């Protein structure tokens, strides 16, 4: 089996490292990649093809893990060449997922839940071909939601509503605590009710959010566009916070 990767960030690198089998070959391309990404690709040992069109043509499973902004363009440009399953793992809205479904055959809507570079992330999938990906449970927990493309997209957006709003609130409250010289005490009192590892998890969440604020802002914009008939006061405040 050949698995092709569009994008070689944390998601793709994690999958490449987790899904290890002599019966599976990973492929990607350096085409249009940054110098840093090219170096990562070379160091990984993954099979490198000349173009992403070649990657799409040769893949039994083609995984798109790029960014919310580029997900649809990637599908429009290369989806027609994909003969196997097209697994989209980008944090995109259901509307964008449905647009991608028009561009590719055999779309499976997917999301990795949990800290992406942990040893036990969980993959959720939906779509008519989702059953064919359940073999991945041998390498990471894989759960099928339904046969309907878009269901996972809705779930991961709802999760993002919670996680990104909480992250923005953590950033704001910890900065105020730091201003008053009470940062350690702030996490200590919260740990009483939130658990002993709350400080560690919170600092990790804050760091991740600040280091990836552009991508997370794009994801929040997708949420606001899709749930435009809902009360999104907290989401809009989180977006404003991340854009500062």
State the predicted function of each range.
Residues 1-57, 116:
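NAD(P)+-binding Rossmann beta1-loop-alpha1 motif at the extreme N-terminus of oxidoreductases
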Residues 25, 47, 85, 106, ...:
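Conserved beta-strand segments of alpha/beta enzyme cores
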Residues 52-54, 60-63, 68-122:
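Rossmann-like NAD(P)(H) cofactor-binding subdomain of soluble oxidoreductases
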Residues 92-163:
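Rossmann-fold dinucleotide-binding core
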Residues 173:
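Cationic-aromatic interfacial patches
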Residues 182-195:
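Small-residue-rich helix-loop
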Residues 192-244:
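Interdomain hinge/lid region at the active-site interface
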């Amino acid at each position: 089996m050949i698995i092709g990767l569009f994008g070689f960030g944390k998601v793709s690198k994690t999958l490449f490292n987790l899904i290890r089998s002599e019966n599976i070959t990973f492929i990607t391309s350096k085409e249009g990649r940054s110098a840093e990404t090219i170096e990562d690709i070379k160091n990984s040992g993954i099979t490198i093809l000349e173009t992403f069109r070649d990657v799409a043509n040769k893949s039994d499973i083609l995984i798109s893990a790029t960014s919310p902004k580029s997900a649809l363009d990637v599908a429009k440009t290369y989806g027609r060449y994909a003969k196997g399953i097209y697994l989209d793992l980008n944090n995109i809205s259901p509307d964008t997922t449905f647009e991608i479904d028009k561009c590719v055959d055999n779309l499976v809507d997917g999301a990795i839940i949990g800290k992406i570079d942990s040893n036990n992330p969980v993959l959720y999938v939906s779509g008519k071909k989702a059953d064919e990906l359940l073999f991945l449970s041998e390498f990471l927990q894989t759960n099928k939601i339904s046969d309907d493309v878009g269901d996972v997209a809705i779930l991961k957006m709802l999760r993002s509503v919670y996680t990104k709003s909480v992250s923005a609130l953590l950033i704001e409250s910890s900065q105020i605590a730091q201003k008053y010289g009470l940062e350690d005490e702030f996490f200590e009192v919260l740990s009483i009710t939130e658990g002993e590892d709350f400080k560690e998890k919170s600092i990790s969440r804050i760091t991740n959010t600040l280091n990836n604020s552009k991508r997370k802002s794009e994801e929040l914009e997708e949420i606001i566009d899709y749930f435009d008939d809902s009360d999104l006061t907290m989401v809009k405040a989180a977006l404003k916070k991340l854009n500062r």
